[in-house]
């Protein structure tokens, strides 16, 4: 699965948030005020996402409606694995060390991580 540029990911996040087929107008209304895009730019992103296999397009009257083919969880898992592979040599330990050594993990984060690991161990 290909990594999406930030602009296309922003569009996909909106579509995933709706969790149903959406129109360009609905996408446009959800974009940040600071980041207003022209209708043609949005349509261009939607066309690219369709070409990449992320979206399918159907008609609802005169309007095109866009549905996600790839769900958010699948994309996030693939991207997480890609980041882990590229930046941390597939090492979860190296990834966590970077977070911890950079003071990006709070005590609460560590407790949640311990609880998650314990839950995974019990399921094995």
Map each language-model feature to its residues:
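Short, cationic-aromatic polyanion-contact patches
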Residues: 4-5, 60-79
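Short, hydrophobic-biased segments on the C-terminal half of alpha helices
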Residues: 43-47
